[in-house]
Design a protein with these regions (language model features):
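Start-of-domain marker
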Residues: 20-71
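Structural register within alpha-helical repeat arrays
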Residues: 25, 45, 59, 66, ...
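Residue at a conserved register position within TPR or TPR-like alpha-solenoid repeats
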Residues: 29, 63, 125, 132, ...
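Structural motif corresponding to the intra-repeat A-B loop/turn of tetratricopeptide repeats
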Residues: 32, 66, 85, 135, ...
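Short coil turns that delineate tetratricopeptide repeat
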Residues: 50-51, 103, 153, 159, ...
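TPR alpha-solenoid repeat register
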Residues: 55, 108, 157-158, 164, ...
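Short coil/linker segments at helix-helix boundaries
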Residues: 62-135, 153-154, 313-353
Length: 398
């Protein structure tokens, strides 16, 4: 028994001695930047010690040197191709393998430990991901962004890690993969809540598509909390917040956000505010917002269309009152409403503003439908063929 124990001990010592001598040779080559020679020694080390943490750690360091070696070569001559195209991925996997074999493995002097090594790879992976993304190689982009995110997390660089998850979400958007887009955005805001208003806007839209009102509300709440001290970024969320409060019929919060949005003076946002005010039946306030905005941009299509929409909605409200009177057999009241100047004014104004909008953009279906209906109600017949053709063409596209 003792004899066998001695044999095993001797075998362990000889293997350890071999691996250390071998690693010393690799280390010396790397220190003198003899990368191809270091690889030859490393191949021999790995063949004899495939389950040794120190060997895997040195292998990963060799891969890092290979990656840098290629960068230096191609910097001098851009026509060259990488000699070690998989070096950076091999380095990443090598560091992981070393840690899995021995979480306390230590590097030789001047070499990277497993965590430090992965941290060094973060920026290169990020650049590789962006290049792959710009070239339309979505699978590679996702892979490299994923590597970069994990590397940044090891460095406790939460902002950079969150940025990688956000970039992955963008890639998934181009792939129309909303489920994975949502997962990446959730990871991004979990790491850094104020990463970007765009993260919350896209998340809201993803949940809105799923008709998940609860999740939509949670996103709005998280966004308000994340940007509570940054009004400039919170402004970017106003349109989404207005959409949410309008969708759940919360006019109190809707009007509060509308007032803040109007105060920004942004023309597009003012046009949106007018629409929400119109939907909330705040017609006079909607008209004031649009009138103020039109003094700055009198030919703005959204503003002109918004004014037409405002009067059309008022007209429909009036006609709803008439219908209720008819249903209640209050025929005199129904007649009075139908003949009222209020109805005629709303109808005429809806037509005139939609007609102005039509002259700026004749291809908007919603505006064209209202314009045609008002022409019918006002008996401005026949309907122009061009208007009918444009409506029919857009309806066929739906």
């Amino acid at each position: 028994m003792k004899k066998w124990m001695l044999v095993l001990v001797a075998l362990f010592v000889s293997v350890s001695a071999f691996s250390q001598t071998c690693l010393d040779d690799v280390w010396q080559c790397l220190r003198s930047n003899q990368v191809p020679k270091a690889k030859k020694f490393m191949d021999a080390c790995m063949a004899e010690n495939p389950d040794n943490a120190s060997v895997w750690l040195m292998q990963a360091n060799v891969n890092v040197y290979q990656y840098r070696y290629d960068l230096e070569r191609m910097a001098k001559d851009p026509s060259l191709t990488p000699r070690y195209p998989n070096a950076i991925e091999d380095a990443y996997n090598g560091f992981l393998k070393a840690m899995s074999l021995d979480k306390n493995v230590t590097p030789k002097t001047g070499m990277f430990g497993p965590k430090e090594g992965q941290q060094v790879l973060a920026d290169p992976f990020k650049e590789m991901a962006k290049k792959a993304q710009s070239n339309g190689k979505t699978d590679d982009a996702l892979k490299y962004y994923g590597y970069a995110a994990k590397c940044y997390e090891l460095s406790a660089e939460k902002i950079n890690a969150a940025g990688m998850y956000f970039d992955m979400a963008v890639v998934y958007i181009t792939m129309n993969d909303k489920a994975n887009c949502t997962k990446m955005l959730e990871k991004s805001i979990a790491a850094v809540p104020d990463i970007s208003p765009l993260a919350y806007i896209q998340l809201y839209e993803n949940y809105e598509d799923l008709k998940d009102t609860v999740k939509c509300g949670e996103i709005i709440t998280k966004a308000q909390k994340a940007f509570a001290s940054n009004e400039k970024q919170l402004v970017e969320l106003y349109p989404t917040m207005m959409r949410y409060y309008s969708s759940i019929g919360d006019n109190e919060n809707l009007l509060a956000i509308v007032d803040k949005a109007i105060a920004t003076g942004d023309i597009n946002m003012m046009a949106d505010c007018a629409t929400y005010l119109t939907n909330a039946k705040a017609y006079d306030k909607a008209e004031k917002v649009l009138t103020d905005a039109l003094t700055k941009e009198p030919n703005n299509f959204k503003l002109l269309k918004g004014m037409g929409y405002r009067y059309a909605m008022e007209y429909y409200d009036i006609m709803d009152r008439r219908q209720k009177a008819m249903n209640s057999r209050q025929y005199e009241e129904a007649t009075r409403i139908f003949q009222s100047e209020e109805r005629k004014t709303a109808m005429q104004n809806a037509h005139d503003w939609c007609d102005k909008a039509y002259k700026v953009d004749s291809d908007n279906l919603e505006n064209n439908l209202i314009l045609r209906e008002m022409k019918v109600q006002l008996q401005l017949l026949p309907i122009p063929q061009e208007l009918n053709d444009k409506i029919n063409a857009r309806m066929q596209q739906k």
